């Protein structure tokens, strides 16, 4: 590919996929601070958003080999970039880069691509759940405790929420075992295993394992000896159906492209809006802090907020100089600021000290 991105400190911020479900939320958050360029496959879809935000619209179809060129101050990828086109162009042009779309194996590949290229500008791989918000909260809790031995994440997916088609891409990975850190050792686990019930906010939710990038990065960045992420759904029937499909082996024998629609159709039925909610438990020694994150504006809004905070970080506009090279969201200079940064966008963070030896209704594990 011959894409060219050039760094211009006074230039606009480029949002690749900028008028999709998450991109729309991010554009609205970012527009008061920076001029924007929004790209996608069909610019007509972004016309109303461009008028609302004052953004420029351009076509950049990542599946089309036609080259793209722009002079920008930073770029955020909020759409799948399977061939690393945006990443490579940003590194080549010295442009600060944020990505919130990659699942674990693609994040690992991106980190390798970036490391080999030797970037001089920041490369923020912020694909932990909800655009890195889980990792930000884990870092905040770890900072309060003086470290993080274990990190347990429990997600409650609201089936009434708005969602783009990429949001259920994790369904394609439910037939693939993955590696986690447990008690300081690497273990291979099955998706949807270790099911249990966890109280997330006021709701007892059945959750099971899912492959997410923070389970790879948190042991590296926070030195967590155990990192676990599980997911459950607002409909107990949907959770039960998913677990039943797993027991029948559907996600093993139905891994091919011809089954993509069937896999994603188990959950992809976007509604008019719901609440994004997750719980993060961090333990250091005998102390555990439990945080519940609630965003009444939904998961697209919460993911966009993670992208916005990543953008501020790579631009050095969060009270500290911009980093260089590959970084993850939890590597932030001021973790104590996370609650106020979330609250500024209407996201509620409640932290409490957990009672030792809590059962399933307590800790996310």
List the predicted regions and their residue ranges.
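N-terminal Rossmann-fold cofactor-binding loop
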Residues: 39-43, 61-62
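ADP-ribose/adenylate-binding Rossmann-like module
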Residues: 89-107
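Conserved beta-strand positions in the Rossmann-like core of class I SAM-dependent methyltransferases
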Residues: 37-38, 98
């Amino acid at each position: 590919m011959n894409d060219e991105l050039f760094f211009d400190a006074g230039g606009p911020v480029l949002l690749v996929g900028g008028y999709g479900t998450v991109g729309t939320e991010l554009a609205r958050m970012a527009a008061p601070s920076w001029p924007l360029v929004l790209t996608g496959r069909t610019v007509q879809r972004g016309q109303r958003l461009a008028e609302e935000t004052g953004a420029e619209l351009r076509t950049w179809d990542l599946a089309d080999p036609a080259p793209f060129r722009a002079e920008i101050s930073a770029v955020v990828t909020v759409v799948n970039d399977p061939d690393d086109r945006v990443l490579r162009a940003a590194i080549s042009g010295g442009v600060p880069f944020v990505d919130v779309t990659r699942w674990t194996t693609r994040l690992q590949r991106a980190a390798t691509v970036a490391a080999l290229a030797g970037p001089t500008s920041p490369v923020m791989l912020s694909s932990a759940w909800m655009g890195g918000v889980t990792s930000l909260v884990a870092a905040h809790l770890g900072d309060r405790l003086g470290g993080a031995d274990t990190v347990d994440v429990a997600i409650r997916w609201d089936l009434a929420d708005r969602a783009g088609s990429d949001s259920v891409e994790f369904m394609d990975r439910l037939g693939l075992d993955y590696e986690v850190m447990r008690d300081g050792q690497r273990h291979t686990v099955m998706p949807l295993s270790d099911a249990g019930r966890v109280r997330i906010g006021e709701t007892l939710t059945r959750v099971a394992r899912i492959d997410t990038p923070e389970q790879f990065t948190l042991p590296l960045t926070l030195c967590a000896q155990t990192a676990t992420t599980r997911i459950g759904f607002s409909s107990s029937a949907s959770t039960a159906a998913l677990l039943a499909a797993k027991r029948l082996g559907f996600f093993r024998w139905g891994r091919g492209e011809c089954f993509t629609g069937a896999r994603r159709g188990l959950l992809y039925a976007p509604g008019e809006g719901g609440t994004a909610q997750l719980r993060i438990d961090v333990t250091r020694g005998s102390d555990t802090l439990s945080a519940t994150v609630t965003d009444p504006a939904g998961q697209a809004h919460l993911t966009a907020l993670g992208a916005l905070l990543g953008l501020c970080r790579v631009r050095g506009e969060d009270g500290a100089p911009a980093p260089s090279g590959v970084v993850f969201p939890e590597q932030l200079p001021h973790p104590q600021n996370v609650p106020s940064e979330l609250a500024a966008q209407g996201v509620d963070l409640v932290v409490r000290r957990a009672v030792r030896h809590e059962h399933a209704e307590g800790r996310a594990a």
